């Protein structure tokens, strides 16, 4: 599975999501991720809204296999439910 994390510098939830993705990529052969710095890439929240299909107020915004998962807390819950993380 391939995960994309859209985040920004200085965001503690972005750091937390990236750390979780890094942990998963080391523990699982089937998990890869890419972190995209929205400021460095010139991506706005309005751009993300077009992909997500609803208003985006916060980052990170996380997608797994092109399916929108949500923010950091949503990603942690998804990992727990789908990858038996923290079990």
Curated annotation (Swiss-Prot):
Keywords: Deoxyribonucleotide synthesis, Disulfide bond, Electron transport, Redox-active center, Transport. It comes from the Bacteria. GO terms for molecular function: electron transfer activity; glutathione disulfide oxidoreductase activity; protein-disulfide reductase activity. One of its GO terms (cellular component) is cytoplasm. It holds the Pfam family Glutaredoxin. One of its GO terms (biological process) is cell redox homeostasis. InterPro entries: GLR_AS, Glutaredoxin, Glutaredoxin_subgr, GRXA, Thioredoxin-like_sf. Disulfide bonds join 11-14. Residues 1-87 form the Glutaredoxin domain. Monomer. PANTHER family: GLUTAREDOXIN 1 (PTHR45694:SF28), GLUTAREDOXIN 2 (PTHR45694). Belongs to the glutaredoxin family. The disulfide bond functions as an electron carrier in the glutathione-dependent synthesis of deoxyribonucleotides by the enzyme ribonucleotide reductase. In addition, it is also involved in reducing some disulfides in a coupled system with glutathione reductase. NCBIfam families: GRXA, PRK11200.1. This is Glutaredoxin 1. It comes from Salmonella typhimurium (strain LT2 / SGSC1412 / ATCC 700720). The lineage of its organism: Bacteria, Pseudomonadati, Pseudomonadota, Gammaproteobacteria, Enterobacterales. The gene is grxA.
């Amino acid at each position: 599975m391939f995960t994309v994390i859209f985040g920004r510098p200085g965001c503690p939830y972005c750091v937390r999501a990236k750390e979780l993705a890094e942990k998963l990529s080391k523990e699982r052969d089937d998990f890869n991720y890419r972190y995209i710095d929205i400021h460095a890439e010139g991506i706005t929240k309005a751009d993300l809204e077009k992909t997500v299909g609803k208003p985006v107020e916060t980052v990170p915004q996380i997608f797994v296999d092109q399916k929108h998962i949500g923010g950091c807390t949503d990603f942690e819950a998804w990992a727990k439910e789908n990858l038996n993380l923290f079990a």
